[in-house]
Amino acid sequence: MSKFVFVTGGVVSSIGKGIVAASLGRLLKSRHYSVSILKLDPYINVDPGTMSPFQHGEVFVTEDGAETDLDLGHYERFTDTSMSRLNSVTTGSIYQAVINKERRGAYMGGTVQVIPHITNEIKERILRVAQNTNPDVVITEIGGTVGDIESLPFLEAIRQFRKEVGRHNVIYMHVTLIPWIPAAKEMKTKPTQHSVKELRSIGIQPDILVCRCDRPLHPGMKEKLSEFCDVPVESVITCQDASSIYEVPLILEKEGLAHQTLELLRMENRSPDLSQWQSLVEKMQSPHHDITVALVGKYVQLSDAYLSVVEALGHAAIASDSKLHLRWISAEEIEAQGAATFLKDVDGVLVPGGFGIRGVDGKVQAIEYARENQLPFLGLCLGMQCSVIEWARNVAKLPEANSAEFETETPNPVINLLPEQQDVVDLGGTMRLGLYPCRIAPDTLAFSLYQKEVVYERHRHRYEFNNSYRTQFTDTGFVVSGTSPDGRLVEIVEYPHHPFFIACQFHPEFHSRPNQAHPLFSGFINAVLKRRNAPAKIAVNCHTVTEDHEPS
């Protein structure tokens, strides 16, 4: 039978529960325990698929096509384990399931209530994760902050859960904040005391406290927290701020988090093997090169909107012994001031996914600049579609080319709606989602990176390359290097007469791992590094001249 760890958060939101849950998962896996991590989100949306990136951050897509919270990306990257739609639960999905059951008569005419019907559905979802893959430990993160009205059904459900599966099969872990008060020149435990008091008022006594702080907790502070929160002093864990999230598992291992967890669950505390993770962190902390990459997007004011892209770039930078300087550039500002203003001193350009017409022309201009100036370029999803539009307008002599998403009456719809999307009305959960195969053409950049004939990547899109223009593109030098197995759907495009110019319809960032960077990102960063270390080249009327590269 699986054991269960429930992670709650107190004092403030964005306390880092997801990183703590993911780090615990890594520590347990280092002891050869299997782990699955579940996120319970208190918002009433069925999933985050239709939410604004400014409100929610990125939508992380699982292999089975679920649109989920970005924390699932942390879970996958830290544990190197793929999650599924079972690992993401929202209040909206719970209520939807209960109401559907009521409509079918499943409750035999009874009054449907939060207790027991909503709480039973929540418990059923937790058990479903355990039954699906039978992991040794299921870690469940409860979204929101203790005290929020939205979280109450989830907290009540996990309170009941312990009684039903056995006391020694469940522990409660509370992540909280110990703030430093500059005026008093001391750390304060009172917010944590009140947070634990709130948790205890609904029947949950935390077994472990994970204390977020910007400096070490001294022993006296731990003893105080132990006394007032009724937690053994050895279960008061310091989680001090770190320069990278990948340091957190090592910090928590040193503090004894995994040891305390296993002891409370009556599991063997096996010897951990964190040597690879330690090497990863050491390599990240001592880079030999500096590179600058421009990320040209629509939602650059909120970095979480592109979280997996940033992480994937970081993984590739670590692998190449490089320190990545990421320059966030608004596509709309490029429209106003021109691409050269922002891109003249970067080493590479990445255009990520997105939706809507705002900023599209700026992305197209950025891609044109990268192509003409021999800047390494990587396009993802909408980034690929923009590269197709750029090529059509500037090389294939179709100046009015556009995507049907942005201009329904364009005379040259080089990007068109997928046929299966023609009659779709609802927005939520209706795109081409999840893992699909891609067949890669030999003797292409894509094949040199993947070294495979068929790869599987995650998708999230409604529009595709319009095959009516494929011959016109290939005749002008554009290469279709990856397609669906039947050859119909264009998955990867590239321009061979360029140091590195490749774009894909899928989202490779979702498959990148700290210890195994994705091939497309590795290739991109290696090309960026090669350019950085070589004499600069500037395009002049399709020819290149070499200049001395000024040190920076």
Curated annotation (Swiss-Prot):
Respond yes or no to whether keyword ATP-binding is given for this record.
yes
- Residues binding ATP: 14-19, 71
Which EC class does it fall in?
ligase
Q: Which UniProt keywords apply?
A: ATP-binding, Glutamine amidotransferase, Ligase, Magnesium, Metal-binding, Nucleotide-binding, Pyrimidine biosynthesis
Sites binding L-glutamine sit at 354, 382-385, 405, 462
GO function terms (MF aspect):
ATP binding; CTP synthase activity; glutaminase activity; identical protein binding; metal ion binding
EC id: 6.3.4.2
Q: In which pathway does it act?
A: Pyrimidine metabolism; CTP biosynthesis via de novo pathway; CTP from UDP: step 2/2
Which reaction does this enzyme catalyse, per its entry?
UTP + L-glutamine + ATP + H2O = CTP + L-glutamate + ADP + phosphate + 2 H(+); L-glutamine + H2O = L-glutamate + NH4(+); UTP + NH4(+) + ATP = CTP + ADP + phosphate + 2 H(+)
Where is each Glutamine amidotransferase type-1 domain found? Answer: 292-534
- Any one cellular component term from GO for this entry? cytosol
Map out region (Amidoligase domain) in residue numbers. Answer: 1-267
Question: What residues form the catalytic site here?
Answer: 381 (nucleophile), 507, 509
Question: What residues does CTP bind to?
Answer: 13, 148-150, 188-193, 224
The family note in this entry says: Belongs to the CTP synthase family.
Query: Main role?
Result: Catalyzes the ATP-dependent amination of UTP to CTP with either L-glutamine or ammonia as the source of nitrogen. Regulates intracellular CTP levels through interactions with the four ribonucleotide triphosphates.
According to the record's subunit comment, the protein's assembly and interactions are: Homotetramer.
Please give the name of this protein: CTP synthase
